[in-house]
Curated annotation (Swiss-Prot):
Function of the molecule: Involved in a general secretion pathway (GSP) for the export of proteins.
Record protein name field: General secretion pathway protein B
Membrane topology category: Single-pass membrane protein
Location(s), subcellular: Cell inner membrane
Pfam families reported in the protein's UniProt record: T2SSB
Upper classification of the organism: Bacteria, Pseudomonadati, Pseudomonadota, Gammaproteobacteria, Aeromonadales
Transmembrane segments: 37-57
This protein's record includes keyword Cell inner membrane: yes
This protein's UniProt keywords: Cell inner membrane, Cell membrane, Membrane, Transmembrane, Transmembrane helix, Transport
Protein source organism: Aeromonas hydrophila
Gene Ontology CC annotations of this record: plasma membrane; type II protein secretion system complex
Top-rank lineage group of the source organism: Bacteria
Family: Belongs to the ExeB/OutB/PulB family.
InterPro entries for this protein: GspB_C (IPR032389)
Stretches of the chain forming a coiled coil according to its record: none
């Protein structure tokens, strides 16, 4: 009985058949328009995805190469030029007077005549050599004995002597070779150094000047400032 009731209920219910699209049937216009819109939307999306993939690939594979380079700085020392300084020196002291060498006569008994003539010639030579020295020494010794230091002159006579810059002093046993350099000029014995000032003698360590008839001495290589 129950079995019959179930069969009747099934017969009364509507039967459902699934819709299976037939192959080869024409597609409607509405479905074709929907497909076109889908393709238009997918095309830009595909382009954007391709561009993003390309940018990501280049970003990963084209990273900048970083390399540390050490730069060595060369320091050039400054060039300093040193000029040599001129050396200012005083002239050398005058040479000592040349000694007079007298030959010694040895007696020879075998030739008395020759010894006599040699001794006579020697005496004549000695007399000739000593005569100029004696003539020059006498006035010089007299002037030296009467000379006073130039600093001891009275003020009136000091003003007559100009400033003297002593450059050089040359003394020799030969009076013709004696000379001094004063204020850049060379003077010899008897020369006028300035108006009223005469150089009358050049000794080994000083000179004798005559100022208004008064003899004064000035040390060699010592400047006179006036």
């Amino acid at each position: 009985m129950s079995t019959l009731l179930k069969a009747l209920r099934r017969a009364e219910q509507p039967q459902f058949t699934p819709h299976i699209p037939a192959m080869g049937l024409p597609v409607t216009q509405e479905e074709e328009q929907n497909r076109r819109w889908i393709w238009w939307l997918l095309a830009p999306l595909a382009l954007l995805m391709g561009a993003g993939a390309n940018y990501g690939w280049h970003l990963l594979n084209n990273r900048p190469i970083e390399k540390t380079v050490e730069v060595k700085e060369v320091v050039t020392p400054p060039f300093v030029r040193v000029e040599p300084r001129p050396m200012i020196t005083r002239p050398l002291p005058p040479p000592l007077p040349e000694p007079v060498v007298r030959p010694r006569v040895t007696p020879n008994d075998s030739a008395p005549a020759a010894n006599g003539s040699q001794g006579l010639a020697e005496r004549i030579m000695n007399a000739l050599n000593s005569t100029p020295l004696m003539e020059e020494t006498a006035p010089q010794a007299q002037s030296e004995s009467q000379a006073m230091p130039i600093s001891a002159l009275p003020l009136e006579l000091k003003q007559r002597v100009p400033p003297l810059a002593y450059g050089s002093h040359v003394f020799s046993s030969n009076p013709a070779k004696r000379a001094v350099m004063l204020n850049g000029r060379e003077f010899r014995e008897g020369s006028e150094v300035a108006p009223g000032v005469t150089l009358i003698a050049i000794a080994q360590d000083y000179i004798i000047l005559q100022v208004a008839g008064q003899n004064v001495s000035l040390k060699a290589l010592q400047d006179w400032r006036g």
